[in-house]
């Protein structure tokens, strides 16, 4: 009898396994998307005062044809901007090597060949291109030669227009503040039901204002049409060359030399030797350049801590005398009325942060911002050093910077108290620097082919539960049959 039981057991188990296998093969499957691989992109932001490298990453499959991009890492290039190497183009290229070596480590090796690498130069190179196009070309050729030596997919080095710089800064700000697309708690991307913010960027050589508008564009050059994340946007943008912080300081310095013989925006007790060649070498100060001046001559200049004269000096930077349109900002440039909330970054942030944090002054309203600027301009050099130790390098220029920001926002762009209440001053958002570079990469990802998503065969949860129950039933049935056979074998045989 035991032999009979042993002979029945394998067929029973085999039948159960076969039945389970047949059921498994009959269950319909569907394609389930695997987590997408990451792609990387590198942007070198070649500004007027310095160069920064940003490495971005995004899923290889994209959301509505624009990559979901986040900052992976960054690196500040030592030295000045590449435009400062006009007499030594190879120095511009060599300055980038340290950050490029870091990029080799930050981007996975297997992704090097597919990682696009871009260099975008802004107002510093725009100015150099105006005064010395040959030198500008030589600098771009030198950095191009170095960038092509690395295993990345180099896509070019070029000078961005002021319009591009403004628009890409606007894209960055709104992306980081989740106005285009947001990751919800349900684990899906969705478009939030809120408007966009305007963006104001104050660089070293230019300043940009960009915002979405429904007003008709009287100057077509100031209107840009964008398509991001399946949505269409019409924005106003304008870039003012020579109105960046560094160039404004140079222009004020040139005016002070010509008009006063002292600098009303510098603190009393501060003096320095000014090299005339440094003051007048920029095209921004060319109109103020005296005839037959000695570029190697040095002039001693002292500060006077005079906020009223400083305000007059800053006001001279703006012209409101003529406007060929229904309304203008300044210098005859068309601008619709500012609308909605704004984010102000770069030197806007650093200036206001100095007033708010270092000086402890309120800046929540335009009136408070003006009072804070006057407060700083009233300080002597000794008082400023005692109040803000450790910032000697730029300390003497904060009065002029604060006056300029206040005048630019109130008189230049036309912010009143109500509109100014909607302006936030911000350096970073979501651990990512606010600037044009991320917006540039977001725009360029429309041109980068998406990898097809990886697929694997998967089973619905409900089907999986049914299979589990069937397997368990088959095994239980086999066990019951086995026990019955064993029990039958133990009973006494009848004759």
UniProtKB/Swiss-Prot annotation:
Enzyme class: hydrolase
Binding site residues for ATP: 204-208
Active site, UniProt feature: 165 (proton acceptor)
Transmembrane segments: 8-28, 463-483
Organism domain of life: Eukaryota
Tissue and organ expression note: Brain, placenta, skeletal muscle, kidney, pancreas, heart, ovary, testis, colon, small intestine, prostate and pancreas. No expression in adult thymus, spleen, lung, liver and peripheral blood leukocytes.
Cofactor(s), names only, from the UniProt record: Ca(2+); Mg(2+)
Pfam families xrefs: GDA1_CD39 (PF01150)
CC terms in the record's Gene Ontology section: basement membrane; endoplasmic reticulum membrane; extracellular exosome; plasma membrane
Glycan-carrying positions: 64, 129, 294, 378, 443
Chain ranges on the Extracellular side, renumbered to this chain: 29-462
Residue intervals annotated with topology Cytoplasmic: 1-7, 484-495
Listed Gene3D superfamilies: 3.30.420.40, Exopolyphosphatase. Domain 2
Record-linked PANTHER family: ADENOSINE/GUANOSINE DIPHOSPHATASE, ECTONUCLEOSIDE TRIPHOSPHATE DIPHOSPHOHYDROLASE 2
Protein name: Ectonucleoside triphosphate diphosphohydrolase 2
Gene that this polypeptide is encoded by: ENTPD2
């Amino acid at each position: 009898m035991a032999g009979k039981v042993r002979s029945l057991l394998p067929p029973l188990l085999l039948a159960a396994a076969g039945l389970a296998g047949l059921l498994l093969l009959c269950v319909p499957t569907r394609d389930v998307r695997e987590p997408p691989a990451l792609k990387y992109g590198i942007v070198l932001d070649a500004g007027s005062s310095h160069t920064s490298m940003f490495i971005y990453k995004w899923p290889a499959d994209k959301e509505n044809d624009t990559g979901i991009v986040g900052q992976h890492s960054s690196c500040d290039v030592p030295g000045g901007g590449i435009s400062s190497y006009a007499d030594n183009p190879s120095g511009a290229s060599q300055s980038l090597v340290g950050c490029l070596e870091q990029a080799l480590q930050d981007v996975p090796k297997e992704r090097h060949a597919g990682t696009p690498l871009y260099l975008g130069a802004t107002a510093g190179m725009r100015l150099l291109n105006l005064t010395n196009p040959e030198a500008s070309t030589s600098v771009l050729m030198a950095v191009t030669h170095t960038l092509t030596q690395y295993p990345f997919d180099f896509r070019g080095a070029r000078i961005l227009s002021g319009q591009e710089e403004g628009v890409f800064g606007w894209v960055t700000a709104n992306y980081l503040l989740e106005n285009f697309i947001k990751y919800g708690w349900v684990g899906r991307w969705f478009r939030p039901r809120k408007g966009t913010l305007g963006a104001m960027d104050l660089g070293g050589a230019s300043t940009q204002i960009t915002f979405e508008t429904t007003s008709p564009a009287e100057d077509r050059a100031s209107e840009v049409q964008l398509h991001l994340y399946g949505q269409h946007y019409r924005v106003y943008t304008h870039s003012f060359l020579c109105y960046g912080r560094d160039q404004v300081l140079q222009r004020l310095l040139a005016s002070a030399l010509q008009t006063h013989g002292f600098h009303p925006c510098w603190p009393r007790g501060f003096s320095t030797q000014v090299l005339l060649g440094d003051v007048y070498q920029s095209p921004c100060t060319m109109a103020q350049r005296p005839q037959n001046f000695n570029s190697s001559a040095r002039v001693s200049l002292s500060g006077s801590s005079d906020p009223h004269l400083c305000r007059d000096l800053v006001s001279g930077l703006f012209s409101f005398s003529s406007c060929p349109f229904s309304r203008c900002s300044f210098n005859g440039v068309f601008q619709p009325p500012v609308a909605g909330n704004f984010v102000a970054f770069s030197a806007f942030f650093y200036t206001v942060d100095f007033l708010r944090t270092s000086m402890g002054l309120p800046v929540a309203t335009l009136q408070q911002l003006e009072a804070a600027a006057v407060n700083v301009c009233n300080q002597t050099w000794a008082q400023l050093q005692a109040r803000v130790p450790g910032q000697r390098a730029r300390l003497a220029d904060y009065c002029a910077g604060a006056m300029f920001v206040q005048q630019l926002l109130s008189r230049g762009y036309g912010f009143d108290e109500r509109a100014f209440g909607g302006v936030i001053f911000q350096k970073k958002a979501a651990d990512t620097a606010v600037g044009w570079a991320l917006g540039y990469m977001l725009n360029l990802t429309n041109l980068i082919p998406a990898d097809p998503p990886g697929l694997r065969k998967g089973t619905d949860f409900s089907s999986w539960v049914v299979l589990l129950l069937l397997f368990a039933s088959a095994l239980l049935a086999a066990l019951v049959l086995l026990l019955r056979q064993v029990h039958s074998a133990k009973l006494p045989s009848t004759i």
